[in-house]
Amino acid sequence: MNAKKEARLRRARRARAKIREQGVSRLSVNRTPRHIYAQIISPDGGQVLASASTLDKSLREGSTGNSDAAAKVGALIAERAKEAGITEVAFDRAGFKYHGRVKALADAAREGGLEF
């Protein structure tokens, strides 16, 4: 594993430890060069309560690796969280910089009604 990925995973571990202490559901984001994924995970970490990604049938058309697609995923995860009765989450960016696609997803989720 290269140093850049190790540093990202180290940041992610620290953030997840702090989120675990808070005892709230977390909005976990994972990004690849082609897709972006979002999951709302229960406070104990044992269950996925809602999920959305650019692989969903409704979002698959068009480009999937840009900020516009990430914003659509953010809006969709906020909608699915409301259906599951979740309004407050902790944002887990998995060590990725809060910039670009990660920021677009977070902003869209906030606009959709999620608080973090």
Curated annotation (Swiss-Prot):
InterPro entries: Ribosomal_uL18_bac-type, Ribosomal_uL18_bac/euk
GO biological process, one term: translation
Membrane spanning residue stretches: none
Superkingdom of origin organism: Bacteria
CDD domains on file: Ribosomal_L18_L5e
A GO-annotated cellular component: cytosolic large ribosomal subunit
Alphabetically ordered keywords of this record: Ribonucleoprotein, Ribosomal protein, RNA-binding, rRNA-binding
The protein's role, per its UniProt record: This is one of the proteins that bind and probably mediate the attachment of the 5S RNA into the large ribosomal subunit, where it forms part of the central protuberance.
Protein name: Large ribosomal subunit protein uL18
Originating species: Chromohalobacter salexigens (strain ATCC BAA-138 / DSM 3043 / CIP 106854 / NCIMB 13768 / 1H11)
Gene: rplR
